[in-house]
Amino acid sequence: MKRSACLPLLLAAVLLCSCGSNAKKAPERASLTSEERQFATPSDGDPIAIFTTSLGEVRAVLYPDAAPMAVYNFVGLARTGYYDNTIIWRSQYGFAVQGGDATGTGTGGSTIWSNNPYPLEADASLKHYAGALCAAFAQGGEVSGGNSQFYFVAALPDSVSSSDQQAELTQNGYTDAQVAAYAGAGGLPYLDNTDTVFGQVYQGMDVVDAMACVETTKDENGNDTWRPTEDAAITIEKVEITTYPGPAAAAEEEGSVG
């Protein structure tokens, strides 16, 4: 991610998050029927990542066919435990939540190639819809390509709701299905072709939204740093790489009989 975005207005129907003095509101996300691959149920055997965090579990399907280097790097690091007990260092409401930097500063990161970055892998079939799992550059642009850092798109459902926005997408060559998906799910279309999308959340988007509305710190000028406060810190306890459907979620196991 190279820049922040102006936050759009929130939908009227929302849920209140417990986020301290600067409480924010998490959106109600309707299920979306779309022919776009990012909204399809994963197929048995598809590679997935299970993020166990201090706020709950997030599951994302990975796309090695479209972003092979990003997926290979992410999977390789996850299997070494690189992401275990790291933090979400950026929680930008209406935009994204970002982690994957073992230093916790947002300026670090690593790769499986002796920290050498990998190039952009922009695939026309993958867009920055809400819930997209994306590779990110280190903050400040010191790195000339991707590394271990990643972010979940947490754009609000109405972020691409205006007819002017949708008309602009059409003029820029987006298909009707892509425009409809952005209109229904929200997203960050201006990041398309600038960052690599390598996965999509299919379970736990409510957890992503909870991450995005935690209390964050302000700098000496009163500007939001988008960094969670110490009391609101979010830990990525572990990232497990497996195949769909994966193990049952903890809540399902606790509620099972026999």
Predicted regions and their residues:
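Cyclophilin-like peptidyl-prolyl cis-trans isomerases
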Residues: C19-G258
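Sec-dependent N-terminal signal peptides of Gram-positive bacterial secreted proteins and lipoproteins
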Residues: R3-N22
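Residue-level detector of alpha-helical hydrophobic segments embedded in or interacting with membranes
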Residues: K2-R3, F152
